[in-house]
């Protein structure tokens, strides 16, 4: 039998699996009442999940001080491997004080359920302002990522984790495809080149345009919307998923697209998060990754194409995934189609610029996005969710 290799190796060379075996799980559960407890917020829960399924490979747990410091200052792990976002577990001094390095810690979710174990190897303090300036390029507390950073505890707990059990996603079990499964799926489809697309918004016409431009070049599209923690004004995940389903059914070749959920939390770290998103999609088996305008940005904290420029700071082999950089797409009223400044002869007044923010603003005003912004079926679904009257 011929060996059918993955299209791309995971980051660091090996896909991490930190889901406890049945035997490990039984052992941990038998100790549950005797272990010190740390309660996780929703973001930490999603981080545990992403580590356990290998999406954050090569991480096997929460970062040591050496990995953390180098990630913050150089976008690398202690071993030199590219990594741009700190993955840490923060607690207060009060919580950290009695915890013994070398011991096991029970990790509970917000409902008090025992979901994971941490082998505590290190406790360390860190400089929040340094992290804010380096990772988010600002220490403005209005920035949602900085706001989370400044509200969390002052001590990091480091060490390997074990997720007790992989539970089906409560809302989208059909679309819960872990990295090991997505890699197998791509092999089964015979895809050698796969482009990943990260989104936290319903797909508007500009997104559709750049996805299809990419799909002209590669074998398959991995549409990977984020369903972890986002900002309060982001559109709810269940609404977005219905929009993706409708869009794929009507406007995409279904044999060339895979839709799956990304259970990670959004950091809004702009350029650094673009690198992070690319590395995560590499772990899912993608060979290419779409980077559009202001990727993972928020407000006016980052330049339009800063998230593209940051890829130039690394040698291609260091990342191991190819960024596909697209200019800001718009609807051209002269040619009656989607375009960018590379392909359209139009004047500025003939260009309708689209964004998820504009779509959200229109919906909040009770307005239906026009066909130049969103496909009619998607606009109707958004309107229903926002209780906007849809004209017959």
From Swiss-Prot:
Entry-linked Pfam families: ATP-sulfurylase (PF01747), PUA_2 (PF14306)
Enzyme class, first EC level, given as a word: transferase
Keywords in alphabetical order: ATP-binding, Nucleotide-binding, Nucleotidyltransferase, Transferase
CDD domains membership: ATPS
Stated family: Belongs to the sulfate adenylyltransferase family.
GO biological process terms, semicolon-separated: hydrogen sulfide biosynthetic process; sulfate assimilation
E.C. code: 2.7.7.4
One Gene Ontology MF term: ATP binding
Organism: Nostoc punctiforme (strain ATCC 29133 / PCC 73102)
Keyword check for Protein transport: no
Database matches in HAMAP family: Sulf_adenylyltr
Reaction(s) this enzyme catalyzes, per UniProt: sulfate + ATP + H(+) = adenosine 5'-phosphosulfate + diphosphate
Name of the protein described by the UniProt record: Sulfate adenylyltransferase
UniProt entry tagged with the keyword Transmembrane: no
Disulfide bridges in this chain: none
Pathway: Sulfur metabolism; hydrogen sulfide biosynthesis; sulfite from sulfate: step 1/3
